[in-house]
Design a protein with these regions (language model features):
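A generic beta-sheet turn/junction motif
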Residues: 145-147
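Phosphate-binding and adjacent anionic-ligand microenvironments
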Residues: 1-142, 151-153, 160-189
Length: 189
């Protein structure tokens, strides 16, 4: 993350704000070029102190964020396919989804397919497919770089209705996520 931030700042005369990787690495700001949580922990401690001074908890703050921007429900599912046959199956799945992406998943139209194999936004090419569905849902597919696995990431954004308990919104999100995951997994079978 830090190297990409430095390269971006040099190439675009921009300012690095935050970076994130799927393996839960965060880097916040340019002062500490660390992706393993040191700078993020400091920012989190500052957030906790700010909320405590107002008689609130970090969870209260998070609830406010959910109500303002929506509740995000995510899941990662890895399909392990050992051996050379397994690697061929993973390559075949990526090729098949590139050539004929689904028009819809779980009743939600696939609005955009982003194929990162060509590189995008100044990033180098990567064997990743991103399916952007109606309503802010996403499915991301990529082979593992170190194991015989096809990694699949599922994301659903749920609007929280005024006065709706967050537990109810979360349950709706989990149900939508399960339907999205199951529909995609059936296409991989």
């Amino acid at each position: 993350i830090a190297n990409a931030a430095i390269d971006y700042e040099r190439a675009h005369a921009g300012r690095f704000v935050m970076g994130y990787e799927e393996a839960i690495g965060f880097s916040v700001g340019p002062l500490v070029r660390d992706k393993d949580g040191v700078s993020a922990a400091v920012i989190f401690a500052e957030l906790a102190a700010w909320n405590r001074a107002r008689g609130r908890s970090v969870l209260d703050h998070l609830d406010d964020v959910y109500r303002r921007v929506g509740l995000f429900v995510t899941e990662q599912v890895s399909l392990t396919r050992p051996g050379s046959d397994g690697l061929a199956q993973i390559r075949d799945a990526m090729t098949r989804f590139r050539a004929a992406p689904p028009a819809a998943l779980a009743g939600h139209a696939v609005e955009t397919v982003v194929d990162l194999a060509r590189g995008t936004g100044g990033l180098p090419p990567s064997d990743v497919l991103v399916f952007k569905l109606a309503g802010g849902r996403r499915v991301i597919m990529r082979p593992s770089g170190t194991e015989p696995k096809l990694k699949n990431y599922y994301e659903v954004r749920i609007e929280v209705a005024p006065g709706e308990p967050l537990a109810d919104a979360r349950a709706r999100g989990q149900a939508e996520l399960a339907a999205l995951r199951d529909a995609h997994q059936q296409l991989l079978a």
